From Swiss-Prot:
Organism of this sequence: Levilactobacillus brevis (strain ATCC 367 / BCRC 12310 / CIP 105137 / JCM 1170 / LMG 11437 / NCIMB 947 / NCTC 947) (Lactobacillus brevis)
Function: Involved in unsaturated fatty acids biosynthesis. Catalyzes the dehydration of short chain beta-hydroxyacyl-ACPs and long chain saturated and unsaturated beta-hydroxyacyl-ACPs.
Keywords for the protein's UniProt record, in alphabetical order: Cytoplasm, Lipid A biosynthesis, Lipid biosynthesis, Lipid metabolism, Lyase
Any Pfam family the entry gives: FabA
Domain of life: Bacteria
Chief location category: cytoplasm
Protein name as catalogued: 3-hydroxyacyl-[acyl-carrier-protein] dehydratase FabZ
Protein's UniProt keywords contain Cytoplasm: yes
Organism lineage: Bacteria, Bacillati, Bacillota, Bacilli, Lactobacillales
Amino acid sequence: MSVLTAAEIMTLIPNRYPILFMDRVDELNPGESITCTKNVTINEEFFQGHFPGNPVMPGVLIIESLAQAASILILKSEQFQGETAYLGAIKQAKFRKVVRPGDVLSLYVEMVKQRSNMGTVKCTASVGEKVACSADLTFIVAAADDKI
């Protein structure tokens, strides 16, 4: 059973098809951690060109999936409700496993540091028991209508 459905996710973050990379939130501990699921299907638009005959999810889109999960974690904190989280930096990104159509990508994000309008999270994307990607992300939070 999910904590948040895709429809509920879309009330929190501005991403939409074809750039919404999350199907559900499975576990949420506001201000601490979040676990989400992305079902990777052959119908994803990026598979048309990455790579024909050998479809692989681009690493940058795995990072984007983690950033979207981080956004939900951040925006579910009382102090940031109604605002938007923006990716500010990517550090220590490592790619260890190829993600292919049919894989279920499990996204885990843990809050490391948070102060005023910015913070850092530690992220892991896994397929089964194997880590596909890990990274530390820094975010900035601003009003949804701010031009930053």
